[in-house]
């Protein structure tokens, strides 16, 4: 049957199938389930596993009498609350005489007699094994103290109709440049979000949307010239998205109430209140076309009578301006990615449109953990629907984006039946198709001539000339034919020779082939390549200027086991310059001195599995998730699956000081079922080039990409491109071990079985694979977060209320039922058992990480840290896992993770000593991130630039009691 997280028992029962009558009868009814049935050779005995309280045992049934008794208890923990890919229990078997059962538990093999009162006999065994493992994959990524930084991403880049200019956004500000050799220039001096530019048909104007936390959004028009003239088109602030300018001079866009976006706590908001509207660019009244109804990618052709849109199943549709006469022109699909979780009959690939933008219709959980009721060990059967199908202005072909690649397809004439085109193999598509991208692409767009195509990736931008590509291919075919003709002539000449002459020619050819060292390799066939330009926009990095002395505090440096009971830490600008005993440092005049008497100093915490998903497509200027994590002492984060590339811009905004938050690192979208079914090493190299060259993520998430060969391609390509890959646990112990053997340096989520013995933990430790167990979403039992929700007064936490929007906090902490889980007796929780394995790993010199999984932003990190510590490791070990281990896991241990001279100034000042009680990690008085000193409660900056935190983006007042009604 299906499995699920936070499961109720029973999960399994045993059935008996009558092969003559074809009937199935359930023969067990145990609360703790019944599983792994094992029959004796003589048919007299049945042994099966079951759970009693929180432990698993073996039950012996006499099949003649029906009587049962416990044969062995406790034994190996069962895997009934997981996918159990190796079986719910290890296999067992009766001896040929049916008198003994051979089973394994407790790390040993046992011989169990069916006679009651007989003690189990250990069967001694020893295995001497030399285990071949891939070399350790580790890179160090320096953080440069430069004054400026190159923007990582350009977004929504669109060419002018004639292709001579390019409009795009960087850090949510609108730029225009002459294409391809111009210098990017700001269009306005606005200090709010500018997004989604669209050109007028004559190329002289640009329309774009805005967002401001106080004012809301509007639509603007910029007339480009010597001095750009900018005017606001809309008269009512609202939530606007995805404008498009038609050839009959109408600006069409999506509109929703301002509240819809202002109140959104995550990327997922309802499309129910959004409309498709149009306005005259000269002003006037907004005209309603239709409700959005899960449609998007608004665009136009030269046929001004119709509006073109997409639906989530990959269809290109059109309708008239009054929303009548809707037609479907084509339905497009791509490859079948490995391990997709689409359900039977579901054709949208878990995508939907919100305010005209294609969005993943899922939560962070579903895109980082194996979804309940699914098994991703086999490829799915449904191809990916196109995310965008954009009709060319000429109306005879379309630009397609599917699984992060871009194609051009021919649109067949309408004959009544909707044509379905697969671009999985363009050479065999039902209508002419062409793949344009080699390494992926985003934001596809046409030029007016319907011949040139544009797309972006990171800060790279490409143009592809379809006619030039066809001409290039035609020239290759002509050259091939000429070569074949020459070969044919040579063969005819050879046939005319006598036997001796042919033998001489053959001998010469063999000698030449032997001496030609290049004969063993087949040169790649030349092909047309898109033209690439790196769009360079530099922004000033946020870097403080000042000196801070943290004096007379307990300093837990994480430099080995060093603890300075009364120590000082000196910070100049954004670096620690000295750490020592009280009064031993040379302090510059004018330093800001913070008396830390009675307090404890630790490095800023590193969250190695932090899902912080802000708003996609349109970006806010302050992000509550970022503020919450920083206020709770998390100064560095790594999101190991972001689903989209929006994080690249958000990370730049933090680096620029536009958003207050921790350091934002990520793997970008996971490499795996997100988009791929890898064919070979070369394709894998191309896929990873997105991350190494264009996203600059430094780490990647190898997310169940497929079989072991495919996984080995990923780690080989990652090593070549200096990327550190982490892996998805997937509730599959065998998978986890092969990933370890292949040299992967990271593992996300707990290993699904426990206890773990030293053969496993020592191997992981020696391989230096960092295990981030994410115990708040434990495998194999109730999630640890449910322990805290039932033992803590979460909703009443004032600090949490300050940083968490009401809807988010109330939904998580007032009631917990269904998939969130509920109440579980303490003994049934498994997080401490998993934590024992982490302790064994750390005791043997291994690496672990603290990953909050985005379950409860801010405080959730401490819950995870306390859970990791619950397996018996010392408090100092737990703090090391939270700091220097985490920094090592993401290649930043030379810059972060300890309090040492030369490292970046990420420091927490705690009111209480976490060495005495690990829960004192949540006694934060001050947070210092990159040399800036913040109040640990309000996150107001104290030094060097005193200023209050802007909370307009998420703080709102509740209702005022004004009725006099008493309950």
How does the language model describe each region?
Residues 625-645, 661-672, 694-705, 715, ...:
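Divalent metal-dependent hydrolysis catalytic cores, especially in the metallo-beta-lactamase
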Residues 674, 686-706, 750-871, 876, ...:
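Active-site neighborhoods of metal-dependent hydrolases
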Residues 41-42, 96-97, 161-162, 201-202, ...:
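Residue-level detector of Asp-centered blade-edge/turn motifs that repeat once per structural unit
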Residues 537-539, 555-568, 581-583, 859, ...:
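Acidic, glycine-enriched loop/beta-strand segments at the rims
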Residues 599-658, 676-682, 735-745:
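Metal-associated gating/positioning segment near the N- to mid-region
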Residues 1-15, 24-35, 44-67, 74-86, ...:
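A flexible loop/linker signature enriched in serine peptidases of the S9 family
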Residues 561-602:
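Histidine-rich, glycine-flanked metal-binding segment
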């Amino acid at each position: 049957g299906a499995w699920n997280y936070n499961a109720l028992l029973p999960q399994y029962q045993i059935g008996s199938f009558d092969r003559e009558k074809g009937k199935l009868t359930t023969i067990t009814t145990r609360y703790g389930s019944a599983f792994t049935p094992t029959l004796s050779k003589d048919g007299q005995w049945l042994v099966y596993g079951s759970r009693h309280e929180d432990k698993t045992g073996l039950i012996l049934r006499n099949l003649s009498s029906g009587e049962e008794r416990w044969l062995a208890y406790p034994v190996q923990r069962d895997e009934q609350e997981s996918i159990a890919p190796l079986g719910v229990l290890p296999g067992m078997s009766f001896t040929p005489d049916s008198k003994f059962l051979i089973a394994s538990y407790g790390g040993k093999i046992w011989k169990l007699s069916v006679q009651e009162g007989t003690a189990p006999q250990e069967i001694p065994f020893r295995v001497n094994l030399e285990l071949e493992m891939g070399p350790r994959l580790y890179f160090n990524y320096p953080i440069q103290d430069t004054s400026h930084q190159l923007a990582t991403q350009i977004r929504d880049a669109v060419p002018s109709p004639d292709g001579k200019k390019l409009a795009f956004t960087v850090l949510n500000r609108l730029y225009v440049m002459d294409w391809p050799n111009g210098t990017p220039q700001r269009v306005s001096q606005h200090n709010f979000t500018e997004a989604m530019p669209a050109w007028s048909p004559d190329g002289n104007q640009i329309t774009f949307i805005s967002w401001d936390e106080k004012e809301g959004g509007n639509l603007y028009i910029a007339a480009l010239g010597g001095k750009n003239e900018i005017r606001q088109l809309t008269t009512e602030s609202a939530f606007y998205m995805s404008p498009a300018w038609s050839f009959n001079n109408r600006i069409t866009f999506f509109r929703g109430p301002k509240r819809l976006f202002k109140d959104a706590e995550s990327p997922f908001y309802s499309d129910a209140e959004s409309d498709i509207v149009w306005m005259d660019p000269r002003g006037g009244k907004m005209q309603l076309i239709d409700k959005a109804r899960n449609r998007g990618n608004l665009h136009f052709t030269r046929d001004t009578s119709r509006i073109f849109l997409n639906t989530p199943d990959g269809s290109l549709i059109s309708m008239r301006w009054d929303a009548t006469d809707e037609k479907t022109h084509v339905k497009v699909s791509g490859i079948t990615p490995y391990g997709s979780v689409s359900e039977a009959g579901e054709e949208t690939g878990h995508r939907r449109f919100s305010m005209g933008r294609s969005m993943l219709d899922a939560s962070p959980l579903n895109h980082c953990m194996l979804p309940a009721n699914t098994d991703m060990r086999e490829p799915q059967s449904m191809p990916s629907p196109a995310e965008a199908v954009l009709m060319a202005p000429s109306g005879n072909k379309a630009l397609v984006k599917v699984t992060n690649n871009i194609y051009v397809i021919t649109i067949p004439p309408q004959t009544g039946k909707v044509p379905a085109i697969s671009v999985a193999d363009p050479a065999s598509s039902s209508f002419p198709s062409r793949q344009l991208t080699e390494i992926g692409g985003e934001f596809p767009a046409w030029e007016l001539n319907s011949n040139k195509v544009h797309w972006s990736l990171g800060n790279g931008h490409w143009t592809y000339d379809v006619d030039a590509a066809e001409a290039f291919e035609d020239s290759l075919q002509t050259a091939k034919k000429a070569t074949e003709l020459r070969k044919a002539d040579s063969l005819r000449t050879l046939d005319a020779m006598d036997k001796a002459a042919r033998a001489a020619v053959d001998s010469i050819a063999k000698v030449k082939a032997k001496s030609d060292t290049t004969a063993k390799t087949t040169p790649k066939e030349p092909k047309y390549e898109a033209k690439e330009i790196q769009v360079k926009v530099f922004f000033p990095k946020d870097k403080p200027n000042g000196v801070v002395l943290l004096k007379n505090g307990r300093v837990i440096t994480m430099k080995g086991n060093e603890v300075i009971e009364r120590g000082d830490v000196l910070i100049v600008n954004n670096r620690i310059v000295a750490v020592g005993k009280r009064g031993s440092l040379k302090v510059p005049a004018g330093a800001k001195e913070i008396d830390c008497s009675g307090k404890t100093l630790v490095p800023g915490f590193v969250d190695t599995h932090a899902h912080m998903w802000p708003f996609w497509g349109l970006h806010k200027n302050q992000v509550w998730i970022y503020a919450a994590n920083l206020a709770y002492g998390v100064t560095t984060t790594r999101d190991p699956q972001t689903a989209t590339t929006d994080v690249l811009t958000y990370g730049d905004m933090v680096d620029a000081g536009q958003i207050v938050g921790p350091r934002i690192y990520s793997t970008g979208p996971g490499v795996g079922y997100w988009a791929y079914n890898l064919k070979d090493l070369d394709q894998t190299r191309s896929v990873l080039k997105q991350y190494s060259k264009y996203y600059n993520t430094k780490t990647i998430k190898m997310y169940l990409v497929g079989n072991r060969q495919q996984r080995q391609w990923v780690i080989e390509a990652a090593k070549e491109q200096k990327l550190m890959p982490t892996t998805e646990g997937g509730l599959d112990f065998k998978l986890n071990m092969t990933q370890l053997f292949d040299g992967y340096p990271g593992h996300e989520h707990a290993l699904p079985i426990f206890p773990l013995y030293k053969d496993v933990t020592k191997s992981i430790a020696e391989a230096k694979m960092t295990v981030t167990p994410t115990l708040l979403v434990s495998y194999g039992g109730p999630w640890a977060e449910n322990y805290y929700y039932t033992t803590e007064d979460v909703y009443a936490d004032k600090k949490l209320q300050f940083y968490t929007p009401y809807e988010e906090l109330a939904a998580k902490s007032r009631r917990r039922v269904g998939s969130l889980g509920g109440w579980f007796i303490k003994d049934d929780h498994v997080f401490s058992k998993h934590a024992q394995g982490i302790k064994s790993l750390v005791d043997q010199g291994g690496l672990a990480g603290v990953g909050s999984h985005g379950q409860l932003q801010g405080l959730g990190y401490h819950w995870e840290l306390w859970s990791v510590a619950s397996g018996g490791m010392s408090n100092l070990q737990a703090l090391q896992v939270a700091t220097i281990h985490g920094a090592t896991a993401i290649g930043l241990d030379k810059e972060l993770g300890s309090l040492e001279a030369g490292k970046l100034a990420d420091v927490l000042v705690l009111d209480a000593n976490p060495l005495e009680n690990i829960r004192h990690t949540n006694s934060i008085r001050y947070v210092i991130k990159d040399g800036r000193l913040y109040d640990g409660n309000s996150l107001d900056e104290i030094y060097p630039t005193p200023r209050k935190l802007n909370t307009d983006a998420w703080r709102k007042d509740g209702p005022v009691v004004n009725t006099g009604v008493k309950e």
